[in-house]
Amino acid sequence: MAAAHRVSHEPAYVLHRYDWSESSLILEVFTRHHGRIALVAKGAKRPSSNFRPVLLPLQPLQLNYGGDAEIRTLKGAEWMGGHVMPTGEALLSGYYVNELLLRLLARDDAHEALFDAYAGVVQVLAGDHAGAQAATQAAALRAFELLLLREVGLLPSLDVQTLTLEPLVADARYTLVPEAGLRLAAEGEAALSGADWQSLQGVLDDRAPFTATLREIATMNAGSNSALRNQLRALLNYHCGVSTLRTRQMMRDLQAL
């Protein structure tokens, strides 16, 4: 019998966890080199377990695991430190990012650049960037959404009209729609200028795309930020197959209290 595949010292984040037995958990984990995987953490619910205080969402971990089945076995987990747990709306935003990954990433499909972007957005949400404000956190979410859509092949080129491949005109208005990609906007549609879309394409192609895209979005005015958010939300909901993501609905419910 072939030896079970073992992975050591793998950078990872817990996306979701649920009960497997009275004492164990199933984890959905995003790893840097192996993508999204499922792990069983045996005994993790016991008070004496070393896993218990470590296996938390939105925290940088280093994991050891093994096995060839669809659900591998967790052998070791270490918290890598660096930031505290996000709180309040930032925590819900972190859960929102996790929900996107669970819905859009296939198992065992590595996305190293996306992993690095995820680490970046978690740091912003945790306030690692001095004086991180709501606007910075919102820009980080938009940057991550764009990078996620591109990584999974759902974002068209942002410097041409999708169906005609005609270059964008800088002062014309274009909208991003699920069925047709980027096209000229009709009156009243959420849209950005051709110059804005071209700038976004440029920063997405940067060697450090998350940071470059965050900075670009942070320079946009409130109207452009709102238009970008609405277009990306519609595109993500379409590809996730839902009208509203669970975490988005949770945010709305809390804001209505």
UniProtKB/Swiss-Prot annotation:
One Pfam family name from the record? Answer: RecO_C
**GO CC list:** bacterial nucleoid
Kindly state which keywords UniProt assigns to this record, in alphabetical order: DNA damage, DNA recombination, DNA repair
Question: Per its UniProt record, what SUPFAM superfamilies does this chain match?
Answer: Nucleic acid-binding proteins (SSF50249)
Which GO annotations describe the biological process of this protein? Answer: DNA recombination; double-strand break repair
- Which InterPro entries does the annotation name? DNA_rep/recomb_RecO_N, NA-bd_OB-fold, RecO, RecO_C
Reading the lineage from the top rank, the first entry is Bacteria
Q: Which family does it belong to?
A: Belongs to the RecO family.
- Functional summary from the UniProt entry: Involved in DNA repair and RecF pathway recombination.
UniProt-listed NCBIfam families: reco (TIGR00613)
Would you tell me the protein name for this molecule? DNA repair protein RecO
Q: Which organism is it from?
A: Variovorax paradoxus (strain S110)
